[in-house]
Amino acid sequence: SGAQPKAAVVAGMVGVIAEINPKAVEVRHGQKWVDEVYTSLDELIPRIRQASANKEAVSLAYQGNIVDLWERLVTENIHVDLGSDQTSLHNPFAGGYYPVGLSFEEANRMMAEQPELFKEKVYESLRRHVKAINTMAARGMYFFDYGNAFLLESSRAGADILKPNGDFRYPSYVQDIMGPMFFDYGFGPFRWVCTSSDPKDLATTDAIALEVLEEIAKTAPAEIMGQLQDNIHWIREASKNNLVVGSQARILYADA
């Protein structure tokens, strides 16, 4: 979707996102939804180290296979704080997942001409995919499921994705992040759209939201102060990062 690189920059992080489809990379880079594009891991890895050392807020796209990226992060011993996966594994054999070892074009041909072999390649890739993630998690990375059937399809592939009791190794972001941090305290996703399509109207609504949040924060209990400060940061930074695609709209996880 392109939201991940923007989110990383807004949050002040170094975001690294893999995308195998060159057209998708070109579009997002052209829209300025990702800052830099790399086709070589030999060039990307030093850039990650540099950006981390300098504490940059920057998004880096790797035009290539996600498994190659994860495995290289393992061998290079790159520290990763947060990891996730957003491949469309609800549709693993018809374009939702591209297996490691095949180019974008090769995968598309095999998908159409040799579907059973392609399925085998997907499952082989998922086993390698999970192995690399498990290694990174053992080194301290927090990995979460994005609700995209990654855990389910990995289990079907025979990957090491289950705990001894049969539960998945990793939680979903709703279960482990959004629920405890937001929903349990009455915070929910509110959206508004400026039907005038005027950016000035969106700026006005941002200013109103910021004023309300700052007023609430003056007397808010400590257990929700972090959420409020995150929301204040979000509203302040949203317009600076050119997040609008289409309608002049905003989302805010506000306290109902």
Q: At which residue positions do the language-model features occur?
A:
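Structured helix-beta-strand junction loops
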Residues: N54, H79, R139-G140
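Catalytic or ion-translocation cores adjacent to nucleophile or general acid/base/metal-coordination motifs
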Residues: G2-A53, D85-K131, F168-F183
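Active-site-proximal structural scaffolding
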Residues: A18, L41, Y62, I66, ...
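A structural signal for short, well-ordered beta-strand segments and their strand-loop junctions
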Residues: I17, A61, L82-D85, Y142-N148
